[in-house]
Amino acid sequence: MLAGEAGNLVAQMRRGVLPYCVLAMLTNKEQYGFELVHALGGIDGMVTGEGTIYPLLARLRRQGLVETSWQESAVGPPRKYYRLAEAGQAALAEFTESWERLRDSVDDLLARSAQEPL
């Protein structure tokens, strides 16, 4: 990686973990698309727009990881709500385990390399 490419690296990492972040956000609560966009916007480093979230939600639905239902809204037209499917729970559990191992390995390597050459 060359100097100045860190922004691209962060974007690639975010793109890789975003589906699992969305699955995690649906773990305990059904949400509609704009609600997810707004919530992600409040998390440092996860800012994303509707042009990213809606295609992602459609892909997660096609993969059977989320399910949808239409619900009436107090204001405006009905909204499509997304909830975590059983397959989504399994995918999130597998990702979480893999993420924890990878994160711990990288943290360990960075800590050791700061103290002594590897």
Question: What residue ranges belong to the model's regions?
Answer:
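Short, solvent-exposed loop/turn elements at beta->coil junctions and helix N-caps
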Residues: L9, Q71-E72
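N-terminal helix-turn-helix DNA-binding core of bacterial DNA-binding proteins
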Residues: V10-Y54
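Basic, amphipathic "hinge/linker" alpha-helix immediately C-terminal to the N-terminal HTH DNA-binding motif
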Residues: A74-T96
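Intrinsically disordered, low-complexity serine/threonine- and proline-rich regulatory segments
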Residues: M1-V17, F95
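Short, hydrophobic-biased segments on the C-terminal half of alpha helices
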Residues: Y54-R61
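Glycine-centered, phosphate/nucleic-acid-interacting loop/turn motifs that mediate DNA/RNA or nucleotide
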Residues: G64
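Short beta-strand "wing" residues that participate in macromolecule-binding interfaces
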Residues: T68
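Amphipathic alpha-helical dimerization/coiled-coil segments
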Residues: L2-G4, A90-L118
